[in-house]
UniProtKB/Swiss-Prot annotation:
Belongs to the UPF0367 family. This is UPF0367 protein Syncc9902_0316. InterPro entries: UPF0367 (IPR020885).
């Protein structure tokens, strides 16, 4: 499972959706990056492949960052997504 996580302005909790296939996750990641870069579309609709019926609509102007990572199947010993100074 692949997670696309969006950081929103003035929100401590990120919004995330999941994709089963790496190519689908990469395509969504690129779509969001392009939307951030160009400011279009103004409203971004997202759905999640893991949680049926999960939907989110976001103003692209409120998205500060997007990251893509593979969700580890094992709970223990997995590294946090994003960048970390810890080894």
């Amino acid at each position: 499972m692949y997670v696309i996580e969006l950081t929103l302005r003035m929100s401590p909790i990120p919004v995330s959706v999941q994709r089963k296939e790496p190519s689908d996750a990469e395509a969504l990641y690129q779509e969001i990056r392009q939307a951030i870069d160009h400011g279009q579309p103004r409203l971004l609709d997202l759905t999640c492949e893991k949680v049926e019926g999960k939907k989110a609509a976001l103003l692209i102007s409120e998205v500060l960052a997007v990251q893509l990572y593979e969700k580890a199947s094992a709970a223990g010993g997995s590294k946090r997504p994003g960048f970390s100074l810890e080894s």
